[in-house]
Amino acid sequence: MSSTPPSITVPPCALVFGASGYIGTNLVPRLVREGWRVRAAARSLKVLQARRDDPVWRAVDLVAGDALRPETLGPALAGIDIAYYLVHSMAAGHDFGRLDLEAAANFASAAAAAGVKRIVYLGGLVPREADSEHLVSRKLTGDRLREGSVPVIEIRAGIIVGPGSAAYEVMRDLVYNLPVMTTPRWVQSRSSPIALANLLDYLVRVAQLAPAEGGI
């Protein structure tokens, strides 16, 4: 008598590209707890390896990856279903906009070659008349990723409210330490903040949308 062995469902594999940053640091453990197979990539492998003391990070495949070094992208993307793109080049100085576009083009090309099913990109909210080079670059980076053949879902988030968020902690320190402050005009600008926990929920859920769904 023959019997059919039970089918084994292999969980999807996600690459968190930019895993040493604020969002990546929080997203990796969340994906592991959701049952995903996770690979974390950053320019500095040592930074990621230092997290092995945390049992959650021991379940993560760690690799070095730099979108400005295309030769590192193939190994990082091999066998990946969903790739989270969380990097930028602001630390490079005045040329960061050009480098952001170059990095995005390299990543989109390598993701297509590796057979990645979807790229999830975390962008920023961009006002209609934006004069921030950083925000404009974030928008153009998403556009460049979409020029590739791999479907892209972009989440545009404002100030992220949570422990470790640079923008949030600057505001908190100002409020706690300065009873009176003369403020510049830009503090009157309206913004739509988002809690870190909510953003992580969205990042996980959009990766599970049907292939035909996507966009910004």
Please name every model-derived segment:
Residues 41, 86, 155:
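The conserved SAM/SAH-binding core of class I Rossmann-like methyltransferase domains
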Residues 103, 166-167, 186-208, 214-215:
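Substrate-positioning beta->alpha
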Residues 6-36:
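N-terminal Rossmann NAD(P)H-binding glycine-rich loop of SDR-like oxidoreductase domains
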Residues 46, 50, 54-114, 124-130:
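NAD(P)H-binding glycine-rich loop region in Rossmannoid oxidoreductase-like domains
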Residues 2-13, 202-216:
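Mid/C-terminal beta-alpha module of Rossmann-like enzyme folds, strongest
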Residues 36-43:
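Conserved glycine-rich Rossmann-like NAD(P)H-binding loop of the short-chain dehydrogenase/reductase
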Residues 13, 81-82, 118:
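Structural motif
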Residues 89-177:
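Glycine-/Pro-rich loop/turn segments that contact NAD(P) or position catalytic residues
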